[in-house]
Amino acid sequence: MNMLTALLVNITLSMLLIIVAFWLPQLNLYTEKANPYECGFDPMGSARLPFSMKFFLVAITFLLFDLEIALLLPLPWAIQMYNIDIMMLTAFILVSVLALGLAYEWLQKGLEWTE
């Protein structure tokens, strides 16, 4: 199976699932289904509390650097390859882009909790 066939099959299945999801109505939507579930007890308060934007920015930054580690973990195995220069250049570019992003976030005071 060549790459084009696999791509077409994946796109077709994805579009089919999206179309079916939009065409099917939301059946039996009532207030009990829309309420949050807290271990069988009635909720003590509202579950729709506002989310801290500062925490969100720190969490996204953490996820980006976690992704960096996940992408750099195969580096020791890549060193065993014949073309080490391309792998090291790619790793350097990845770390540089993320370091520039962190520096920009730091200069914009996006990581500080106090206003």
From Swiss-Prot:
Changing residue 56 to L: In strain: Oreas. One of its GO terms (biological process) is mitochondrial electron transport, NADH to ubiquinone. Changing residue 84 to T: In strain: Coolidgei. InterPro entries: NADH_UbQ/plastoQ_OxRdtase_su3 (IPR000440), NDAH_ubi_oxred_su3_sf (IPR038430). Changing residue 85 to N: In strain: Austericus, Coolidgei and Rufinus. It catalyses: a ubiquinone + NADH + 5 H(+)(in) = a ubiquinol + NAD(+) + 4 H(+)(out). It comes from Peromyscus maniculatus. Belongs to the complex I subunit 3 family. GO terms for molecular function: NADH dehydrogenase (ubiquinone) activity. Pfam families: Oxidored_q4. The gene is MT-ND3. Its main location: mitochondrion. GO terms for cellular component: mitochondrial inner membrane; NADH dehydrogenase complex. It is a multi-pass membrane protein. The chain crosses the membrane at residues 4-24, 55-75, 84-104. Keywords: Electron transport, Membrane, Mitochondrion, Mitochondrion inner membrane, NAD, Respiratory chain, Translocase, Transmembrane, Transmembrane helix, Transport, Ubiquinone. Changing residue 20 to I: In strain: Austericus and Rufinus. This is NADH-ubiquinone oxidoreductase chain 3. Its EC number is 7.1.1.2. Coiled coil: none annotated. Core subunit of the mitochondrial membrane respiratory chain NADH dehydrogenase (Complex I) which catalyzes electron transfer from NADH through the respiratory chain, using ubiquinone as an electron acceptor. Essential for the catalytic activity of complex I. It is an enzyme of class 7 (translocase). Core subunit of respiratory chain NADH dehydrogenase (Complex I) which is composed of 45 different subunits. Interacts with TMEM186. Interacts with TMEM242. It is found in: Mitochondrion inner membrane.
